[in-house]
Amino acid sequence: MKKLFSVITLLASISAMSQQNVFFDRSFWNENTSVSQVKTAIEVGNSPSALNEAAFDAPSLAILGNVPTPTAIYLIEQEGNSITKTTHDGRTYLFWAASSGNVALIHYLLEQGSDIYAKDTKGYIPVTFAALFGNTNPKVYEAFFRAGIDPKATYDQGESLLLKTIAFDSEQLPLTQYFISKGLKLKQTSLSGATAFDYASRKGNVNLLKTLRKKVKPTHQALPMAAEGVIRQPNNPIEVYQYLIENQKIPATATDYKGGTALHYLARRQDLPAAQYLIEKGANIEATDKDGNTCLMNACYGNNLELVKLLLKGKEHINKANGKGETALLIALQRSSSEVVALLLAQGADTRAVSKKGVNVIEALLASYNPRKKGNDKDFDQKAALLKQYLVALQGANAHGDTALHMAVVKGNLKLVEKICSWPSIDINAQNEEGETPLIKAALTAKDTSLLKLLIDKGANKALTTSLGETAYELVKENENLQKSGADLSFLK
């Protein structure tokens, strides 16, 4: 009876999780998810091989959810899945097994012939992906070494696995000792000369640093590396910066091989208290890294208004552009809040800024639109109102003659297009340098007819042509999505 009740409960929960694939719901996966639960979910129509919008499938999400190894193996062996299948960021299942530290699953995948040298889109291979996420179990690395990975191999900036993982090690250095037993040296350095001490600073463990200091010297890179931190970890405690600056005498202006200062990384991490401390100790607010990024630009990727205020004390750098031609305002319009945008505009940010790719303030604004993000719709409207307040012509065009409506149409978001259509003075029939109207753009790019019908309903002229004399109706025949759908397109005539 208990077993029957469990099955009924599972079926009910699957039904309640809407029509989407239940396997895409991360709450489905945990240490107790059994093969029988997975089988039941498959029987009622959930696909074990389909990819979600982020290119994760059931096996990858299951592995990340730390399911029992038999459950993961069962999923991997389903039709449509294989050891060579790539998921999010081009990663095979071996990447996910390595990052989660599932040694048994790693062995299974290796026995099945999974490629230990496969690279994801970020340049990682499975063993370095394990190191990236701070895996400290020697058995994980031993499995890869036995499969053919050279323990002494170096990656990226000449970093060995010892350097990559030392920040995650405990003060007794068990993992580091394991790597030393494989022939690695504690005193080895990266291509930039960064030491094991420098790499250890990334996790902010002062006691670990004190242990290592007896054996390895720091370089100035330790400070920016501490500020950069490690992936998916909270900000480091302020004590690590105090130790490095006051005890190890590393200057607050120290840079890493990318030219980044600690303040650059603290700004990106939105760490206001540590940023204040660094500035008190002499950090340069106006420093630029090798890509031309200022600390202010980095702060504009987040929403910490007080941090932006702190970094605006050096006003003369507000309109600096980085190597991509992006200014703090262009970044803030895309990535930050309307409050940050308002502050930048009040302090003299130039609304005429255009990146090297031709992105102006209007296109930067449109890039920020994400209706799935809570509060985004209101924030978007407030940013648009601010630009108008500072005399930006919202109906204006970029260097190629594209208006906000042209740009919105290419994004294909119906709500965004409707919003832009409501802007005063927007010309729904404006033509760019190729003679394309928003309707013609939509004819070429739309995935269904709803966008085209919306534009016509708002007054789009179907008779207008491109510089080559082509109408929207003639060009829609080149739209594979619409042609495959078999949709009636006669309304464009």
Name each region found by the language model.
Residues G134-D256, G260-H264, R268-R269:
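Solenoidal tandem-repeat scaffolds enriched in leucines and small polar residues
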Residues I42-S82:
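N-terminal, post-signal-peptide region of Sec/Tat-exported proteins
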Residues Q19-T33, D150, K214-A222, A227, ...:
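Ankyrin-repeat-protein effector appendages
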Residues Q20-W29, A50-I63, K85-F95, K119-A131, ...:
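Ankyrin-repeat boundary/"N-cap" motif
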Residues A41, L75-I76, L109, F144, ...:
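Conserved hydrophobic site in ankyrin repeats
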Residues S13-S15:
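N-terminal signal peptide c-region/cleavage motif recognized by signal peptidases
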Residues E31-T33, L61-P68, W96-N102, F129-N137, ...:
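Ankyrin repeat A-helix N-terminal signature
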